[in-house]
From Swiss-Prot:
The YXXL motif is involved in determining the exact site of viral release at the surface of infected mononuclear cells and promotes endocytosis. The 17 amino acids long immunosuppressive region is present in many retroviral envelope proteins. Synthetic peptides derived from this relatively conserved sequence inhibit immune function in vitro and in vivo. It comes from FBJ murine osteosarcoma virus. Specific enzymatic cleavages in vivo yield mature proteins. Envelope glycoproteins are synthesized as an inactive precursor that is N-glycosylated and processed likely by host cell furin or by a furin-like protease in the Golgi to yield the mature SU and TM proteins. The cleavage site between SU and TM requires the minimal sequence [KR]-X-[KR]-R. The R-peptide is released from the C-terminus of the cytoplasmic tail of the TM protein upon particle formation as a result of proteolytic cleavage by the viral protease. Cleavage of this peptide is required for TM to become fusogenic. Residues 41-90, 100-136 form a coiled coil. This is Envelope glycoprotein. The lineage of its organism: Viruses, Riboviria, Pararnavirae, Artverviricota, Revtraviricetes. GO terms for cellular component: host cell plasma membrane; membrane; viral envelope; virion membrane. A motif (CX6CC) lies at residues 96-104. Pfam families: TLV_coat. The keyword Disulfide bond applies. Residues 79-95 are annotated as: Immunosuppression. A lipid is attached at C171 (S-palmitoyl cysteine). Keywords: Cleavage on pair of basic residues, Coiled coil, Disulfide bond, Fusion of virus membrane with host cell membrane, Fusion of virus membrane with host membrane, Glycoprotein, Host cell membrane, Host membrane, Host-virus interaction, Lipoprotein, Membrane, Palmitate, Transmembrane, Transmembrane helix, Viral attachment to host cell, Viral envelope protein, Viral penetration into host cytoplasm, Virion, Virus entry into host cell. InterPro entries: TLV/ENV_coat_polyprotein. The mature envelope protein (Env) consists of a trimer of SU-TM heterodimers attached by a labile interchain disulfide bond.
């Protein structure tokens, strides 16, 4: 009778392990989907941010370069007008003498701006080449076809997890079942030993006197 009870107890244990393994499988697939999607979205957002910063720096460089050209053109116009006014007031000793004011002199610092913009363009070019060299084939494929790479990265993780479970799941399940069987056998032996000691401790004379 005890062996039958032990046999009935093993079936729910195996069923529980199967359900547990199935739950771990589904949980692993869900976790793989979530992890792959999150990593892909984070990488895409980082690349978009980097590209946006690169474009903004290019626009700033172009704007400052245009301002430098405009300032250079304006200074040429001002100097040309100054020379013309000096010729008109040549008899009075020039424009400053006619106005009886100190003469203003033009200090050209556009060369520093021009050099800074040239260095900025060079750094932007180097950064763009470095970014393209570090970009892998998967990222290049993502830039060409985002939906396809999203599908691949989403499915790849769960497929790998499912393949690992199919390869190692039966072995692990058999080990767990064997371990539980061994534990049940030990418990069964302990129970039988305890019952044997209880029967052995009973005095036969007391049993006969009761009868």
């Amino acid at each position: 009778q005890f062996k039958r009870r032990a046999k009935y107890k093993r079936e729910p244990v195996s069923l529980t392990l199967a359900l547990l393994l199935g739950g771990l499988t589904m949980g692993g697939i869900a976790a793989g989907v979530g992890t792959g999607t999150t990593a892909l979205v984070a990488t895409q957002q980082f690349q978009q941010l980097q590209a946006a910063m690169h474009d903004d720096l290019k626009k700033v460089e172009k704007s400052i370069t245009n301002l430098e050209k405009s300032l250079t053109s304006l200074s040429e116009v001002v100097l040309q007008n100054r020379r013309g006014l000096d010729l008109l007031f040549l008899k009075e000793g020039g424009l400053c003498a006619a106005l009886k004011e100190e003469c203003c002199f033009y200090a050209d610092h556009t060369g520093l701006v021009r050099d800074s913009m040239a260095k900025l363009r060079e750094r932007l070019s180097q950064r763009q080449k470095l970014f393209e060299s570090q970009q892998g084939w998967f990222e290049g494929l993502f830039n060409k076809s985002p939906w396809f790479t999203t599908l691949i990265s989403t499915i790849m993780g769960p497929l790998i997890i499912l393949l690992l479970i199919l390869l190692f799941g039966p072995c692990i399940l058999n080990r767990l079942v064997q371990f539980i069987k061994d534990r049940i056998s030990v418990v069964q032996a302990l129970v039988l030993t305890q019952q044997y000691h209880q029967l052995k401790s009973i005095d036969p004379e007391k049993v006969e006197s009761r009868e």
